[in-house]
UniProtKB/Swiss-Prot annotation:
It comes from the Bacteria. Belongs to the PspA/Vipp/IM30 family. Keywords: Coiled coil. It comes from Deinococcus radiodurans (strain ATCC 13939 / DSM 20539 / JCM 16871 / CCUG 27074 / LMG 4051 / NBRC 15346 / NCIMB 9279 / VKM B-1422 / R1). This is Phage shock protein A homolog. Residues 29-185 form a coiled coil. It holds the Pfam family PspA_IM30.
Length: 223
């Protein structure tokens, strides 16, 4: 778990504990800032350690690359001197150091990526601390304003009137609902009457068609 994950859990635990105890919001902010500053110091140490590890890996990669080059040179010298076995052993060692250099360099790349991420998170944490510092004064002013509003609410009796207003609004909504229902039922009845008229028109047409057919039949039989 990174230092930033630990910070997040620590802040949530401390803030939730203070909220559950109904602590002053200003105290909660102060405690959060203290936790964040402490975590920031730990995070800087963690980033420094990661950077040191990246530098060490780079150093190891360079050392092994240098040794590989030296053994290749020795292999060439041995071969020129007529010692093929010695040249082969030197090349084997050169290859071993090449493999090590490659491995250290790959690890350095991974470590450097971690360092970059940690630096980004560290800067974000620093910016968040600055933001909370700047908002601290504003929060205190907002708290005083809110407290003044609560005091005014208590002494003016608006808190008591609020209950009556809520009851009135609830009743108004109920009446409006009844009116809407009555209106909907009226529209539904009108729709049903219209459908009935259409149905009657259909029946009248059927009767007219039957009458016309009967007339035609009668006329045909009289001829």
């Amino acid at each position: 778990m990174s230092i930033f994950d630990r910070l997040s859990r620590l802040l949530r635990a401390n803030v939730n504990d203070m909220i559950s105890k109904a602590e002053d919001p200003a105290k909660i902010i102060d405690q959060a800032l203290r936790d964040m500053r402490s975590a920031y110091a730990d995070a800087r140490n963690e980033v420094a350690g990661a950077m040191a590890q990246a530098a060490k890996l780079e150093r190891e990669a360079g050392t092994n690359s240098k040794l590989a080059a030296e053994y290749e040179k020795k292999a060439e010298e041995a071969l020129r001197g007529g010692s093929e076995d010695l040249a082969r052993e030197a090349l084997r060692r050169a290859q071993n150091h090449k493999d090590l250099a490659k491995g250290f360099d790959e690890q350095r790349t991974v470590q450097q990526s971690t360092v970059d991420q940690l630096k980004t998170q560290l800067r974000a944490l620093e910016a968040k601390i600055d933001e909370m510092e700047s908002k601290k004064t504003l929060l205190a002013a907002r708290q005083k304003t809110a407290q003044a509003g609560e005091t005014l609410d208590r002494v003016s009796g608006f808190s008591k009137a609020g209950g009556a207003m809520d009851a009135f609004n609830e009743m108004e909504q109920k009446v409006a609902g009844m009116e809407d229902r009555n209106k909907a039922m009226g529209e539904l009845r009108n729709d049903q009457d219209f459908d009935a008229q259409l149905k009657d028109l259909g029946r009248d047409k059927d009767v007219d068609d039957a009458l016309a057919a009967l007339k035609a039949k009668v006329q045909s039989s009289n001829q």
